[in-house]
Amino acid sequence: MSFSRLPLALAFGLITSLGAHADILNKPVSLKTEGDLVQAVSTTLQHAVAMSEQYRGTEPRLQRFARNEINARRKPIEQLNKIGRIQPMPVKQLSVTPTDDAAYLNAMLRNHAWLIELIEFGRSLPLSSNTKRLIDTLSRDATAELAALGKLEQR
């Protein structure tokens, strides 16, 4: 990149980050311990639930997906919060409300891809057997849901 374009690139990056700061998935994450992983995964799941609760679209398949997402994520969030001895964050305040079907679909694709990435990286950490079991289950579920979302995106 030439130095003449540097100010433009910095300004664009600043504008982009200011517009996206409200979404919790844009916050930096440091995964150094099992507790960090548990916190990050719990927050990502809470984000998915908050987005699904706020979704008011018209697509029946996405409505069904949102209901299933809410029901499927409650128990793992509770388990993660118990394992990590953490208090749930007010994620509803930190997620961007989906404005339509496409926005919700994109938000869920992003959320699930981020969840899978967190889990894959987190597997390199020393994990207790309970956490490892829960993380493995979440990984399988998130991968299957990401595939289902991908099919919905193609329609």
Predicted regions and their residues:
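Bacterial N-terminal signal peptides
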Residues: A9-S17
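His/Met- and acidic-residue-enriched segments that coordinate or traffic transition-metal cofactors
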Residues: F3-S4, G19-R155
